[in-house]
Amino acid sequence: MDKLHLEIVTPQGQIFNDDVSSVVLPGSEGEFGVLPNHASLISLLKAGIIDIEDKHKKHDVVAINWGYAKIDEGKVVILADGAVYVSGNSESELANSLEAARNLIESMSSDTNAFAATISKMENVVRAR
């Protein structure tokens, strides 16, 4: 099975570093998916969520305010200005990380419809876990 390695890095440190099945990124021209053996490219990323599918088909979510993605055949490196890994072992931890993600995205998004759609998608992915 082909592997895809994903790294998400901010000025504060590494947010994510693991092998994944696929990743959906908020590109500046629209969302796009990346699978193993994807063509090489560099893309600007806008405020939104990164939907990560691991090898067990479980989805994780990372919210970013903006950044760049460098994609090679087997590796995706995301350099983000700010990012929040939406996770938690309890309902309160999950609620806190969701709120931090909302605040991060809201600080960069002037389009209220796009903001609402992004938040709704993020909440749906988290609920589906």
Curated annotation (Swiss-Prot):
What HAMAP family does UniProt report for this protein, alphabetically?
A: ATP_synth_epsil_bac
| Signal is among the record's keywords | no
Alphabetical keyword list: ATP synthesis, Cell inner membrane, Cell membrane, CF(1), Hydrogen ion transport, Ion transport, Membrane, Transport
Q: List the Gene3D superfamilies hit by this protein, alphabetically.
A: F0F1 ATP synthase delta/epsilon subunit, N-terminal (2.60.15.10)
Among the entry's GO cellular component annotations, what is one?
plasma membrane
Signal sequence range: none
Q: How does it assemble?
A: F-type ATPases have 2 components, CF(1) - the catalytic core - and CF(0) - the membrane proton channel. CF(1) has five subunits: alpha(3), beta(3), gamma(1), delta(1), epsilon(1). CF(0) has three main subunits: a, b and c.
Report membrane topology: Peripheral membrane protein
Q: Family assignment?
A: Belongs to the ATPase epsilon chain family.
- Principal place of residence: membrane
Q: Name where it's found.
A: Cell inner membrane
> What is this protein's record name?
ATP synthase epsilon chain
Superkingdom of origin: Bacteria
Select a single GO molecular function from the record's annotations and give it: ATP binding
Instruction: Give the function comment from the record.
Output: Produces ATP from ADP in the presence of a proton gradient across the membrane.
- Pfam families, per this entry? ATP-synt_DE_N
